Amino acid sequence: MTAAAANYGCPMLWADGLTVEAPEVSQFEGELIFAENDLAERYAELAPTGTVDLVVIGCPQASVGEARATAAAVRSHMELGQKIQDSRLWVFTSGYNYELLEADGTVDLLEEAGALVLKDTCPEVTPYNRTKYNHILTNSLKAEHYLKSGLNRLPTSVAPIQECVNHAFNPSLSEGPRPVLDGKKAIVRV
C-alpha cells in the first residue's frame, strides 16, 4: 500500500477507519480490498527463483521501523557468529532517518554485520554492476516493479524483511539459474 502513497509525502490514499486524521468523505471514488491472503499470494508469485545476487531494503527509502526490523533480523544471525559476505545486503534510507539510526546504533550494527547503508538514494536510481548483480531480492513490491521496468531492468523478487535478511546471510537459500527479463516479466531459463 505504501507504493500508492508515494508522492513527496502527500497522502494519495486513506484507509477508512485506519488512517489517522483522514478527511471526512461522503462518498468514495473506488474501493480496494487487499487482505492478508492477497499479500501471501503476491509473495508466493514473486518469491525468489534462482540465485539471488543482492538484497535491498527500502523503496524509495526504508523507514526507521523497516531499518530497525532489518537490524533485529541481522542481529539474530550475528549472535550465531554469522556475517554477510560481499555486502549482499543494502539498506536505503533518507539522510534524516540515517541520523536517527546512527544515533541508536542501528547503522553500526548493520555495517558490522557486513551490510551497506545508503542514504538519500533509492534502489531504482542506483547503478548496479551487472557483472555482479543480476537478480535482486527486496522487501518492497514497489521496488520490484521499478527495478524490473525502470532504469536498471533487473530481475527482482520480493519477500518479507526476515526472509530477505536470511538470503543475505545464506546465498544457498535460492540456487539455480538466475531469472532473466522477458519483456517486463522475469523468467528462469534452464
Locations of the language-model features?
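Intrinsically disordered, low-complexity segments enriched in small residues
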Residues: 1-90, 160-190
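Surface-exposed, flexible loop/turn segments at secondary-structure boundaries
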Residues: 21, 97, 144
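Short acidic, glycine/serine/threonine-rich loops at helix termini
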Residues: 1, 24-28, 68-69, 101-105, ...
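Extended C-terminal subregions enriched in glycine
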Residues: 62-63, 79-130
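Anaerobic metallocofactor- and corrinoid-dependent redox/one-carbon enzyme cores
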Residues: 4-6, 108-190
